[in-house]
Amino acid sequence: MRTVLAGSRRAPGCGEGMFILWLVLLLFPGAPAQYSVDDLGGLGRMFDGIGAISGGGATSRLLVNYPEPQRTEILDYLFKPNFGASLHIFKVEIGGDAQTTDGTEPSHMHYPDDQNYFRGYEWWLMKEAKKRNPAIKLIGLPWAFPGWIGNGKNWPYDFPDVTAYYVVSWIIGAKQYHNLDIDYIGIWNERAYDIKYIKLLRYTLDKNNLEHVKIIASDNLWQPIAFHMLQDPELLRVVDVIGAHYPGTHAAQDAILTGKTLWASEDYSTYNDEVGGGCWARILNQNYVNGNMTSTISWNMVASYYEQLPFGLEGLMTAKEPWSGNYVVSTPIWITAHTTQFTQPGWYYLKTVGHLDKGGSYVALTDRLGNLTIVIETMSHNNSICIRPPLPDYNVSAQYATFYLQGSFKNLQELQVWYSSLDINNTKPVTFKKLSPLKVQNGSFTLQLGVNEVYTITTLLTGQKGSFPDPPESKPFPLKYKDDFSVRNPPFSEAPYFADQSGVFEYFTNTSDPGDHVFTFRQVLTQRPITWASDANQAISVIGNYQWSNVTVTSDIYIETPDTGGVFVAARVDQGGSPTDRAKGIFFWVFADGTYKVTGDLMGQTILCKGLAGVRARSWHTLTLHIDGTNAFGLLNGNPLWKEVVTGGPLNGWAAIGTSCFEFAQFDNFMIEVKDSE
């Protein structure tokens, strides 16, 4: 930790002064660089806030299944003001029924005549965010769309009025059913935009008295949207924010020339250790210093998905074990707090921001009511590498920095100090530690800055490093697990721990079945969605521990589609997320035409055995898949159907259920038994 020096001009005694000068020159050669903090020349851009994303996709899937009090604690670390990350902005995926990185999120309209504003968990998360911070800004953005939007094509813009209606219905539903006011809406995450659609979206919003909802475009690169806005006055008028992803702290000149608000509307996406914290610290400052971006939004908010899915642990914190209750408050939470706890949307950057002489950067913000916050970071190259884009080499060294307070701030006498040190060589990094107040003398103060440090210097007294008792110890997924889905009024549409990777699986009530299968788990998509990734043509939901090897998976199954329908249970499934279509494992299928097959892959191309099973649609059957070492066998309704199949594929992976295409099918009395040791 570095000392904080006041800006006194009192001359020390001769001997004392020579010793201090010698020490300073030895450790920090050169006179302290001087930096002005001044609002006399006007202010910079308005600060819009720091945010995070749930979705894109299913990144918060496991969070909803946490027990209390751990679930509330996690939400407090994310959203509660002056406690943890204290997020200003919360961006969610508008579920589109398709794979969007780590899973699928359900649409509020699976079909044209279907509207349900209680599917998934984003509604709940937005309400939890608002409960803690009523001022938090909400953003909705589609990654994918249900298939009917494209009328058979993998494209949402052939009928732009239909797409606009669909998106605006989500905004209206948020208000009508959850009393949530959506502040911003996006176009199509990291995919093509359509100028006609953007204009029609603005028209549809206004027609529905949603003039307050602002449009962000295009959630991809700066170009060509900035160029098109400069060429098209109407497009320039209807787009409120140009949002770019992973901009590397720089904005395109055309984007600046539009005069529009500029955001890093998705950034970070980095493993949440000290290097991830360093990445986040650097871009939170330098996105404005280098690129005039007034908001930076992290993908993702909380890594609450199975770690072996793509981009594991790339959230501001980690909550991937609802079965144990364990979670980890990671370094990026406290780096976020360095800015969010001492600013608010509506504050203004000063024009006096920039780079430090020996590496690093500083920003200064004010509420125009006399409050001042300065955030300083000295992240080295190797301690702040983000996932993208590549980071050019640069050097940072220890330094003194003297800040002169001028304008509205010249009479400040004392400032609060919060400090972090993220050096990867430290055995125990320091995060968000409150230091003694800094006495300002003669309008200045000097900081002795080391490498990989973050300082917040502020007039505000409200900061807090919130904490709870340690969560329970980490534990693997239980070796025995079962679910009969008998929940009359489920709080969420998905059953615990199932992570849909293609298709959508929901709790279902069979009102016409008075027997043992009134409450089931149903795959509900009947059409391939407008995809964001290379989705599988089969529906699949995974569950459990990726390290499982010797496992028995059992489920009652009900094929609803005569002749062509089919379902499976599986184990050792080795892929999820965007490459789900390439998943391998052991898949035990039965079909409505009376056949069965066992395959080594989800696509069904590697057939290990096949034959007749006598299964028909609209009748309940029980499938059991047993794998031990290199051998597998299967049971139908408790009787052997096939045996002595040599696996030959992945040695471990998740358990799974699914369907042979996008079709209605039901599952019940699901059970896993694992022989592996914990």
From Swiss-Prot:
Catalytic reaction list: a beta-D-galactosyl-(1<->1')-N-acylsphing-4-enine + H2O = an N-acylsphing-4-enine + D-galactose; beta-D-galactosyl-(1<->1)-sphing-4-enine + H2O = sphing-4-enine + D-galactose; a D-galactosylceramide + H2O = an N-acyl-sphingoid base + D-galactose
GO biological process, one term: galactosylceramide catabolic process
Entry keywords, A to Z: Disulfide bond, Glycoprotein, Glycosidase, Hydrolase, Lipid degradation, Lipid metabolism, Lysosome, Signal, Sphingolipid metabolism
Annotated glycan sites: N292, N371, N382, N395, N425, N442, N510, N550
Main location: other
UniProt signal peptide: 1-33
Compartment(s) of residence: Lysosome
UniProt EC number: 3.2.1.46
Any Pfam family the entry gives: Glyco_hydro_59_C
Active site feature: E190 (proton donor/acceptor), E266 (nucleophile)
Cysteine-cysteine disulfides: C279-C386
MF terms (GO), sorted A to Z: galactosylceramidase activity
Binding site residues for substrate: T101, W143, N189, R388
Family note: Belongs to the glycosyl hydrolase 59 family.
UniProt cross-references to PANTHER family, sorted A to Z: GALACTOCEREBROSIDASE
Summary of the function given for this chain in its UniProt record: Hydrolyzes the galactose ester bonds of glycolipids such as galactosylceramide and galactosylsphingosine.
Protein name per the record: Galactocerebrosidase
Gene, per the UniProt record: galc
